[in-house]
Amino acid sequence: MEEGELKDTDHLIDIQLDEVTFVRRRPEVEHERAVAIFDLLEDNHFGIKGFQGPFRLVLSLAENRLLFDIRDGEDKPLRKVILSLRPFRMIVKDYFMICESYFSAIRSMTPAQIEAIDMGRRGLHNEGGAVLKERLAGKVVVDHDTARRLFTLICVLHARG
């Protein structure tokens, strides 16, 4: 299945982060999580060959792996996709560093300086989304924006404190 083959029903109607991986996070990280989930549920393209949407998704981290627990609209398990976290490590690390700069900048820097940092943050989002889309190829089909928002949630799962 390719992105062009997605049907109107091929989308996510619910996204959860596994409670085992849930920790109390900084307000800025919680805001990122809430915005990513809201935006995903408003507009996403998510499909699996051999299954018709809509889908529910539970994301979790376990043993250095990212787990996509994909279910149908009535919460019946359909497929689990497990990805190595190794390809994401540097991007996630860089993303956290630039987010720290961004959160500091919004308190004290000029709008032009904040915009420059935000452009770097968006660039890392694009890179992380592209890596995710590539790693999901052959298993799950997502569009660019869906991949970017899912990458945000991968970063949230990595966030501590």
Curated annotation (Swiss-Prot):
Superkingdom, taxonomy of origin: Bacteria
InterPro entries referenced in this protein's UniProt entry, alphabetically: UCP032146
HAMAP family noted in UniProt: UPF0262
Family according to the record: Belongs to the UPF0262 family.
NCBIfam families from the UniProt entry: PRK02853.1
Protein name as annotated: UPF0262 protein Rru_A2770
Organism: Rhodospirillum rubrum (strain ATCC 11170 / ATH 1.1.1 / DSM 467 / LMG 4362 / NCIMB 8255 / S1)
